[in-house]
Structures are given as C-alpha cells and as structure tokens.
Amino acid sequence: FCYLPDDPGVCKAHIPRFYYNPASNKCKNFIYGGCGGNANNFETRAECRHTCVASGKGGPRP
C-alpha cells in the first residue's frame, strides 16, 4: 500500500494526514476527507516513515 497514490476520499472533512510518495522516498502531507481513500494514509509523519521508509517497503520500484 505504500505505492498507492494519495487519496482524499469522498467525504468533505479537512483532516491533515500524511502519505508516502515513492518517487521522492518521503512522506508528504495531504488533506483527507474523512472516509474512503486507501491505506496510504497516516496520522503522523513518523508513522508513515516507520511503515514505508524505515521498513524498506517504500522507495522506487525496481
């Protein structure tokens, strides 16, 4: 799921979240709508980094 694009979902809330960007190998912020979306959605940058950067699950695809 670290390779999924950022997806704000279908609802209209304005919730700051983070997603992993494999092109830059970094976690970036985006605005989540509150429902829907996908699993590339983290409450904190640290959680995103731990899941996708530090674990080796992220990075450019070979």
UniProtKB/Swiss-Prot annotation:
SMART domains: KU. One of its GO terms (cellular component) is extracellular space. Serine protease inhibitor that inhibits trypsin. The recombinant protein also barely blocks voltage-gated potassium channel Kv1.3/KCNA3 (3.70% inhibition at 60 nM of toxin). It comes from Eristicophis macmahoni (Leaf-nosed viper). This is Kunitz-type serine protease inhibitor. Expressed by the venom gland. The record marks K12, A13 as: Reactive bond for trypsin. Belongs to the venom Kunitz-type family. GO terms for molecular function: potassium channel regulator activity; serine-type endopeptidase inhibitor activity; toxin activity. Residues 2-52 form the BPTI/Kunitz inhibitor domain.
